[in-house]
Amino acid sequence: MLFYMFIFYILYFIFYIYNIQNININMRTDDDDHDDNDDMDCAAAFSTYFDRLKKHSRGSGSGSGSGMMSANLKSMYRNWFQQLREADAFLHASPSFISAIVPDIIPTRGNRAALPRPAMIERDKMPFMTSEITDYLQKTEVTHWLKYAASNIRGRSVIVHILHCGGGGGGGSSSSSSISSSISSSISSVSLKRLKMYRSYVYKIYAWFHFIHPYQQQTQQTQQTQQTQTNKENECSKEINLYFYFTPFKKLLPRAPGKTLGPAHANTGFTYPCGMNPGPGGKKSTEIIIFRHEEWFKVLMHETFHNLELDFNTESRTSLRDVFPAIRHDVLMSEAYVETWARILNVAFYVFYDIYGGNGTAAQYNTAVARCLPVERAFSLFQSVKTLKYMGLTFSDIVNPDPAVSSAAARKYAEDTNIFAYYVLAGMLVFNADEFLQWCVSKNAISLMQATHGQRGTSLFKQFISSLCKNERMLANIKLFETFEAPEHMHSTMRMTAWS
């Protein structure tokens, strides 16, 4: 029996070695369960729509009307291309590279006790997960727990947990089944095609944590200098556990008008800032949970910004009533900030890995970014306009200072999660990506991506957002989106990125 187990593992290992030298990070598989074709259809539909819009746009310069990128944006993306190449080289040169992308596979069919129990779920009872998603996770059998671990990505341990839902098949296996057949069943139930897909995901995750490290490392060093602290125990998320529940649920507008937009329509993941983590791991050992397959990588980047405290690092909300008189509730500014960064960076990773599989040249990368980023910027503004339209509002309604207009608009606006930050503010910011990056260069004293913490940071950000409300190019494009009919495929989606 031990001999057969040994032979099986050798064959399994050879499968990975055979593919290792030419890892293709392209996530476009034939996987019907996750239906990546829907993502491609969305991007293709909007891209075609965008081309039509350009003929009618009144924008100029680097706006969506011309589809051009500024020199600053081009320079930023060129720098990120070099960082992604460095991440690629680091991962391939790492002595533990092979073991880091070969998972431990734990069979869990018929044994819920064998599943991992993230501390956040135990403590917070799955925040932001709708009953539809929690019911799905309760009723759909998780057949395998795949655990990947990279112990040293620039000093950080990154542990990836993928909860795999297999195909049908019932009944528990007989207790007399041999160990070798049990292992063989485990591997075959998680198809090699799916294992290859998961491996590409994990590789991209590792590259992300290599990429983001310098920005957060500068934060730690600066804070330690300011506080005269060099104690390694204070380091943020030295170990981070990432839990992926790849449920098939899409973010969609309600079919019937009048329903308040909430977690079912917008949320995909959650975490705590490392310094506020109430779990047993404290600041050093933290968690991020992703509970949809849709836009999972963009959401990981969003949650990482929160987790590593690259945002304003405050739960205090900000009143925007003097900028948007119709918005009477206070807003979490960090949500708009990190969502904007996640969408901008998502384009860099999408082009590098999903289009070219990590093998594109600088020229190919720059050309693809020049095509993808303008579409992303326009899509963000389109989603902003569409979200307000669902509530019977226009952008001019929410910025109009007239008391009668703002009061009428305030009665129409309703949310049960951070809709305004995710869609309206982030839509404005991504559309004005060049201005946003210039603002980060001038106002973020620690690093490009590290926001100034606390009220000072949110006040500066509020001033910047207020200035964007007067941007004529953006206002002209908002009017265009309000009047130009979109393809039917785009009417209901609440996804936040065109490319994923």
Task: Indicate where each model-derived feature is located.
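Hydrophobic alpha-helical signal peptides and transmembrane signal-/tail-anchor segments
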Residues: 1-19
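Intrinsically disordered, low-complexity regions enriched in glycine and serine
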Residues: 25, 31-37, 60-66, 168-186, ...
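Long, compositionally biased intrinsically disordered regions
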Residues: 30, 38-59, 65-141, 154, ...
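Auxiliary, metal-adjacent structural segments of Zn-dependent hydrolase domains
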Residues: 97, 101-168, 188-219, 231-281, ...
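Short, hydrophobic/amphipathic alpha-helical patches that form generic packing surfaces
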Residues: 203-214, 336-351, 386, 414-438
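Short pre-active-site segment immediately N-terminal to the catalytic Zn-binding motif
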Residues: 283-300
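Active-site recognition of the HExxH zinc-binding catalytic motif
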Residues: 298-311, 342
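Post-HExxH zinc-binding segment in Zn-dependent metallohydrolases
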Residues: 312-380
